[in-house]
């Protein structure tokens, strides 16, 4: 997908997103439903333990919650947000971790679902007190940074191949003057070979654009100046702790790897890409 086409898709997606702020007044997760299953209770039993989400969203939409996803470390969730006008909003989503809980003041970024007016799909949840952010998208590098990274990788590979070819040629000819690289035609071919590999790297990097579209749309909705360069992984709790030399000897918990500091990411974006 070309940069222009991807930008257009991101713009359209960002316009579809909407934001709701308020208190988490009800929450249902995969773990909750699995515990209910283990207790020989059905989805309807969630109502008995205080959750009205089953009645609002429906058993069918929550059916996957009670299923065991062995080897897949994600958590489905349904959430009820009560805004300042005491209006209730319902969302369903799937994140690597669900740390937010009832009583938290959050900001939910969501996408309306076609043919569904009872609830929407949550694409990101922001804890307004701690500036923690959770999303279903794990993007290590931004779209442009990922393309440049893969270009450099393929470029380095091509240069290494050329160097090995030169060494092989030298051992055969046993003379620098007689090496094929002294031929202008071979020099041009070598240069074109490196350029082709760099172009292939760009195209391979472009094939991962789809993974960045949703995250870029979220960051665009939040007012980031350069979403295509954003790397939330640099602002995960574990990365920030490592940078500040906190818990250096410990392997980071899963929640630390998938919980991001939005305030630090926004500050970096403003300092690097904001209007001077």
Locate the predicted segments by residue.
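OB-fold/S1-family single-stranded nucleic acid-binding modules
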Residues: 111-151
């Amino acid at each position: 997908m070309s940069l222009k086409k991807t930008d257009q898709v991101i713009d359209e997606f960002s316009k579809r997103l909407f934001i709701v702020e308020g208190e988490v007044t009800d929450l249902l997760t995969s773990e909750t439903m699995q515990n209910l299953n283990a207790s020989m209770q059905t989805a309807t039993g969630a109502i008995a333990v205080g959750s009205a989400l089953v009645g609002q969203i429906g058993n069918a939409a929550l059916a996957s919650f009670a299923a065991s996803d062995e080897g897949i470390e994600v958590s489905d969730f349904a959430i009820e947000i009560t805004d300042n006008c005491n209006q209730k909003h319902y969302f369903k989503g799937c994140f690597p971790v669900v740390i937010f809980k009832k009583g938290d003041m959050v900001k939910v970024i969501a996408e309306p679902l076609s043919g569904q007016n009872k609830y929407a799909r949550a694409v990101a949840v922001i804890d307004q007190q701690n500036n923690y952010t959770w999303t279903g998208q794990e993007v290590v590098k931004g779209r442009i940074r990922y393309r440049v990274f893969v270009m450099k990788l393929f470029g380095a590979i091509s240069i290494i191949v050329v160097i090995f070819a030169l060494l092989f040629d030298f051992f055969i000819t046993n003379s620098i003057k007689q090496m094929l690289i002294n031929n202008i035609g071979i020099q041009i071919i070598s240069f074109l070979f490196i350029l082709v590999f760099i172009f292939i790297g760009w195209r391979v990097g472009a094939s991962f654009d789809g993974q960045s579209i949703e995250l870029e749309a979220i960051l665009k909705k939040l007012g980031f100046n350069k979403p295509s360069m954003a790397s939330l992984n640099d602002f995960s709790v574990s990365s920030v702790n490592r940078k500040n030399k906190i818990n250096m000897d410990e392997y980071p918990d899963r929640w630390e790897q998938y919980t991001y500091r939005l305030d630090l990411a926004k500050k970096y974006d403003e300092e690097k890409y904001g209007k001077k």
